[in-house]
Amino acid sequence: KEKERAVKLIHFADDIYAKLATIRFRPRYAVQGDISDCNTYLTPDGNIGFFDYNCAGENVLFADAVMQGWFEAHLMDYGTELTDEMSDRIAREFFRGYREVRPFTDEETAVLPGMYALISAFAKGNNRYAMTNAVKEQDAAKIDELLDIMEREIPAGRKIL
């Protein structure tokens, strides 16, 4: 059963990666990579400053925007437990505002929900390393738990645009 579920998720990921193929080779730009309320400050003259550049580097702007949108919708401290509906609304507002300044291409708009879902699936519960460890340890219960998380997060039909 786990193998069938894993294969389904792998096919979903492969489809998203295929759609991202042309986007991956776009120009890369310097990005902060981790803009949050704890990494920004307001100067006395009203400018916004950034610090904490541990995630800074070069990235395709679209990829950075999707990751930043996910971060804003899931990892920021809003002082309350976020529901899926609240997270989706935050993501919608982030992407609405972002696209007012830098519109997405049709290609980017088409792949964004799937890419967002994929990030969500692997970010919840630190699946990247948790799954690797569970497979190495042949921990069927942990693998099943992580596949459950991934299946809940994978639906690309969430209203984030």
Regions found by a protein language model. Give the residues of each.
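ATP-dependent phospho-/nucleotidyl transfer catalytic cores
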Residues: 1-32, 89, 139-145
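A structural signal for short hydrophobic/aromatic patches embedded in well-ordered alpha helices
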Residues: 6-9, 94, 111-112
